[in-house]
Amino acid sequence: MFEIELKNSDEMVIRAKDNNVSINVVQSTINADLKVGMIRGAGEFEIGDIAIIAKSLKGGGVMYRIDVEGIKIGIVGSTAVIEDLDELGPIDILGCSDAKYVPVVEPKIVIPMVNMDFAEIKASVKNEKKLKIKNANSLPAVMEIWNLD
C-alpha cells in the first residue's frame, strides 16, 4: 500500500512502505531526504522500493515515470509535447498540468496539478486530501479524477 498527496499544486508526494519521495514538476526536482540532497534533471533512480525514470523534455523540463508496487505513475508538466508522452509507456496514475495529456495516456486515475482545468475531462471527480492505493486490483475500472487539495 502507498499514498499520494500534493504538497502544493506543483509537488506530488508519494509515501511508500519505507520511503517518501517528493517530485516537483515545475522545478524538475526529486526530494527523498537523501544524503546527496535534492536530485535535479533526468536520470534513473531507485529510492528504496520506488523506481523513478526522469526524462528530459524537448520543450525543457522533465517528466517522470515512477513504479511503486507494480503501479505506474506518470508526472508531466506543461512543457511536454504529445510526442514526449510515448516515452512514458503505460501509466496507471497520471499527475499532469494540462488536460490534453489525458486522452493520450489513458490513465485509470488523473491527479490535476499546477491548477489544471479538468472540467473538459469526462470522468467522476473525487475531492480528497490523499489517494491511498492498496494494490493494482484496487485501481478503478473506469477513469477517475482525484482532485487532491
Model-derived segments and spans:
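Core dinuclear metal-dependent hydrolase active-site scaffold
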Residues: 1-89, 93, 128-149
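Short, aromatic/basic amphipathic alpha-helical patches
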Residues: 118-129
